[in-house]
């Protein structure tokens, strides 16, 4: 079984909940889980160029809108990332280049991509049958 959602926020939330279940709710904070997802992941990969926002690092950022209903009433923006269902970043910078703006990938032909994925999925299912 796998919980790989390709969503680092969801994975950090699950890691936090699993650790809280095992060690108690006060043993692990949202800051711990975010540190695992950033600096911790970089350390596991042996990467010095990622894991934090600092001069000389990759400049990878994910920005989330907090005016969505899912964040209503949140008082701690970092806790809200994990606890208020942050599903989709509004803007994403990778290596210093904006790759997602206003929730969309610039110049992506989404209908074409969806059609191609459906074709490939159908071909895979046909091969399995």
Positions of PLM-derived features:
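Amphipathic alpha-helix from the class-I
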Residues: 17-24, 46, 100
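Active-site microenvironment of metallo-dependent hydrolases
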Residues: 10, 35-129
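Interfacial and helix-entry/exit segments of alpha-helical transmembrane bundles
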Residues: 25-37
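Histidine/acidic-residue-rich catalytic or RNA/ligand-binding cores of hydrolases
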Residues: 4-19, 76
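Active-site core of metal-dependent hydrolases
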Residues: 1-6, 20-28
């Amino acid at each position: 079984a796998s919980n790989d959602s390709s969503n680092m926020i969801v994975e950090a939330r699950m890691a936090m909940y699993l650790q809280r279940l095992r060690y108690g709710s006060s043993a692990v904070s949202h800051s711990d889980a975010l540190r695992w997802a950033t600096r911790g992941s970089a350390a596991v990969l042996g990467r010095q160029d990622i894991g934090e926002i600092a001069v000389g690092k990759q400049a990878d950022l994910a920005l989330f809108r907090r005016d969505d209903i899912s964040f209503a009433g949140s008082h701690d923006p970092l806790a809200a990332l994990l606890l208020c269902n942050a599903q989709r970043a509004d803007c994403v910078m990778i290596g210093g280049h904006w790759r997602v703006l206003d929730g969309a990938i610039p110049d992506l032909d989404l209908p074409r991509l969806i059609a191609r994925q459906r074709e490939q999925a159908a071909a895979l299912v046909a091969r399995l049958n």
